[in-house]
Amino acid sequence: MSDAPAVGAFPQTPVAARRGPARPSDSTTSTTIKRTSPLPLAPQAGRQATNISPVIPLHILDAPTQRFYAFAFYLALTAWKLYDWTQVLEEDTESFLLFLKWIAIDCVFLFGLPELRIPWLELSQPFVMVAFAIHAMFDWILMFNIGFPWQSWVIGLLKVFYDREIAISEHNVKLSSILQNSSLIMGRQIINILPEGSAILNPELQPFCLGGDRKTANIPIFFNSTIPVEVELIRTDFETGQQESIKLSKSQLRDIERRAKRESQDGDTVQSIVQFDFPVKKTGAYRLGRVLDEYKLEVQRRNPLTFVVSCPKAWVGPALSAHRCVGDLSDLSMMVEGTPPLKIKYSRMINGKDHSFHFQSLQPEGFVSPLSGLRSNNWGYDEDDISWARAQKVPVGLNESMHSSGDWQYSIDEVQDGFGNIIKYDSLADDPDGKPKPKHLTQSFVVKKRPVIRLEGCDLRHPLKVAKGKSKNLPVSYGLSGGSREDSTYQIAWQFSPIDTLTESGDHGDVVTIGTYTAKNNRDRPTISAPGLYTLKSVSASQCEGEIQEPSSCLLLNPLEPRLSLRHEEIPDTCAGNSIGLRVDLDLIGTPPFIVRYDVISNGERRSERVSIPGLRYQLDLVPRIAGHHKYIFTHVGDSIYDGQKLSGPEYVLEQDVKPAAAALIQHSTGKMSSCLGDQVTVDILLLGDPPFTLEWELIHDGKRKQFKVPNIQENSYQIKTAPLTTGGEYTLGLTSVQDKRGCRNFLQEELKISVRRQSPRAAFGQVDGKRKILAVEGSSVKLPLRLTGEGPWKVYYANLHDGSPDKPKVQEKIIKSDNGFLEVRGRGAFAITDVWDSQCHGVVDPKASRFDVDWFPRPELSVALTHGVSKTETGFQLQDVCEGDVSGFEVALKGTPPFTVEYEVRHHPLQGSSSLSKKKIEGVVGKEAIQADTSKAGTYTYKFTALEDDLYSSNRGFQPIIVKQNVNRKPTASFVKPGQTFKYCKSEQDNEDGIPITLTGVPPFFLEVEIKHQSAAVPEIYRTPAIDSHSYELKIPRHHLRLGTQHIRIRDIRDGSGCHSTSGILSGPSVQVQLFEAPTIYPLETRTDYCVGERISYTLSGQAPFEVWYTFNGVELKAKSPNTNFRRIAESPGEFTITSVSDKASECRAPVSITKTIHPLPAVRISKGKSVRVDIHEGGEVDILFEFFGTPPFEFTYTRSTNARKGQKSQVLETRHDISHEHSKVIKASQEGTYEVVAIKDKYCSFSTQAVVGLEGGKKDKTKKLKVY
């Protein structure tokens, strides 16, 4: 028999024994295959027969039959699997048990099939593994009800073989045989909720300002998921409060639309945030008004005010003059304009060195603004009154002493308003290559040194002597303060009194004239010629008044012309012997030294001689060397002022033909002495010879001689005591002659020059800034300027009239070495000069300038302003208690010399833990400063002001710390003890029912506010608890605040006994769920009692599945089980159908009911004219859904809302609703997204439902909501 199978037959089953080559007898009918190169036969020794046979022998069941049975068994398993899948679809659920079941069955089948060793089904192990994985995946898709693309085709194919449901009689009936009429229910309404659109103006509340270079301000408007077609802004004017409506132009709206489409990820739906910068050119408060989207619906918007204010600016007020002198005040004002409180930064550059200063919290007196941080609420303001945002002008005065010369420049660098708008003006120090600042931002001064003038080489003791008719420069020494001697022009003025009008004390008399002179340079001097007293009164240079230093007075004298008188006698060799020469007495009038010229003619020879005479008297011994006739002719006499005056007359000619004694000496080493005005002079005289002596002497003053003779002097020493010298000037005391016992009178030439002061030493206080009063920093030494005349050093006696007894103040002595010296004192009071001595004479004190008042600059003072919320306590001040995070503060008043520097400590004592300390410093120039209180953490804050400095005082001596305290209460908190837990309650309240436990922190009593959000409600409901007196509480919400189903409970607000509260933003946290159940009941999805044959009678069960339902049909009582909340039966025959009772798993009770249905013939309904209509709305909008009924009213219908089908996704049924209409049409308003379709319709007698079809064609179902079927 041939081994080749017949055509069309199964291949021949291989036999294990037939492994070797075919024998010739076995292949007689086979086709011979010719080989060009036949293979050699395998060795016989290598042949081994294998014994592999099927488990079921082939002689019992051949191989094809075994393969057929295996394939049939696989098809049966597949059909069973598809049946289980249809049950999953019918129940719209998932089954993990079915998945495990089919995983096990497929595993046994696939791994057991190869073990049967059926020919051609001997599957390899890898193939079985891959096949099992594919089956497991297929089981997962089916049993977990996961949609797949060809699912509907499979369902349709299955419906051909299986389309049966349970009827009222509890038998399966084929639905398609009863109901196959899709035209009865037509149409659907698709509502698409557009993304929630919103618009917000300036969400970050950025500050904007207009002014200067900022002509426009671009305010950002953010549009979220919307394309606006109309945008309106409301502008409120700061000045008038009137509102103005501004609308975006069409071009601007088109720009927004282009941006939205460019940013959108979906071409049909806007999902992005679009920013549009709206330019404004007017100041005011802006907010969004009306915003409409492309569907003419109003877009949700937030309306915070955006303030566009005038940009802050500052300028320097005009100064009367750009010139200043050292010691002058700057007298400068700056004006700051903007929305208070303002800040300004300015720099002061002195000779290229920069100094920066800050002024803060600048605002008008009494100005109140929410920007000042002095309110206790969270930056609240009245939108009806925004006048505080208008620009205000605040002057800032600078009045500081300009202590150094050079170029001073004040420059404004930066200004900032209360909203944080900053205008910077670049300074030359920051940008040397930049443009200079405008003139209104700077003020430059040229501070010049003050001139200093004094007389040099002339005073009352050393007058100027000038010949009559001649002039001389007033010896002015000119310079500038600081010791420099810059060349400059200057003007001086002086007082002049003629010499004959001076008082006895040498001061100016009644006749006083004023002289002025403008010097071209510092070497130029005025010329004077009139004799008298010159006293400097003022000096000025470059518009700066200068200082007059001592000596300031000069006396100009015209001395007498020199005159000479001669007396002569012969010189005997003994008291009474022959003459050996002439002794000539020269008596001179004039100003020594003198030069006397004479000619000598001896024995016919003539020669000229010259003698220098230092005084007014001189004895010239003319002793010729040779005997004879000698003639002496005196020709000229001159002094230090006048040149030689010619002498003529016989009295100046002496002739002689040529033939010791008593003496007297003046006991003085130098021959010169000084005396005080009005004092007596005592001169010691040494007499030589034999007493008794007769002494002749004379006193010469001002050209007048007064001779004296003292006889009978018995001692060899004698004191000449003059009368008081009441007239100042030069006196000459000369000894004229002396005679001793022998009677010989001898001529004497001894002289003593006595210089008598023309004025007594004088002491007075100088002036500081034109007055004898000064303010100084407390504790510092003060140098009081003195003006002294006389010969130094001086002893100045002074007293502080405020020190000691008023009648006898304590007198102190001070030695002053300079006539323009200083009296250094270290206390304050009224200092008076009581007496003065110079190096020789007692002086006088100028009564008009004998007193100088010294007082301290007031030390800076700090006090806390007792405004609202600030109270005085024994230890300091107490601020009103605030809550954690609130804004609070207080004001401090400052007195002194600005700018001020205040240092203070902030110590925080928390409710628990250790305290913390921080140090802060503020600088200010105005009299009030706002201190921002720290309320970031709960506890007690202590503000201790430890140091206060102003422009004068940098020490804290005498400053008493000020303490301000404030209690910051912690914000209360509330939280669920079991967050995230679900609490189940029945609709009717039960006894001993547990509440929702809540833990609270804070100060009792508490007032709690919770938010109840039902999943089907658009707006949450608010429930407020009564007062809670403990920190733990069980929340029991009344039933009228709850709805059936699940609701989320969230704590929204809590307020405690201290007045503090926390909002949802702070209390955001886990919520709890509350599920409210009713007792198990059953409700018909339709209220009608008449049905038509072929309809499903559907009920909704409330409670917890599974349910048991008892009912009667045509007098027969039946019991049915429902694994879910849906209970339905097919009305396959007419009759009375009555539900008698129902029970569920949760209640475990049987609730009696009586629901009777009468089965009757099918109504029709069309939704949206029988078409599929799509409408796009915004959330919160509504759509009218039109239902048209055909049948006998009234109509009851059930419709579903499903998710809208999207590409690659199946829609899900979200909810099922039923309604009633007594007309042939009905409009229902819908606001939720989804596809609305009628699944059941009922008229007066009949009803029709397509839910079974929907359930099979709707794709993937919602796993949380059971589909309600009829």
Swiss-Prot record:
Stretch list, region Disordered: 1-45
Iron-sulfur is among the record's keywords: no
Record localization: Nucleus, Nuclear pore complex; Nucleus membrane
Any single Gene Ontology cellular-component annotation: nuclear pore transmembrane ring
Biased composition (Polar residues): 25-35
Positions on the Cytoplasmic side per record topology: 1-67, 117-126
Membrane topology: Multi-pass membrane protein
InterPro entries for the chain: Ig-like_POM152 (IPR056541), Ig-like_POM152_1st (IPR056542), Ig-like_POM152_9th (IPR056543), Ig_POM152 (IPR056544), Pom152 (IPR037701), TMD_POM152 (IPR056540)
Ranges per topology, Perinuclear space: 89-95, 148-1270
GO function terms (MF aspect): structural constituent of nuclear pore
Motif segment (Nuclear localization signal): 756-763
Function: Functions as a component of the nuclear pore complex (NPC). NPC components, collectively referred to as nucleoporins (NUPs), can play the role of both NPC structural components and of docking or interaction partners for transiently associated nuclear transport factors. POM152 is important for the de novo assembly of NPCs.
Protein name: Nucleoporin POM152
Taxonomic source organism: Chaetomium thermophilum (strain DSM 1495 / CBS 144.50 / IMI 039719)
Gene (UniProt): POM152
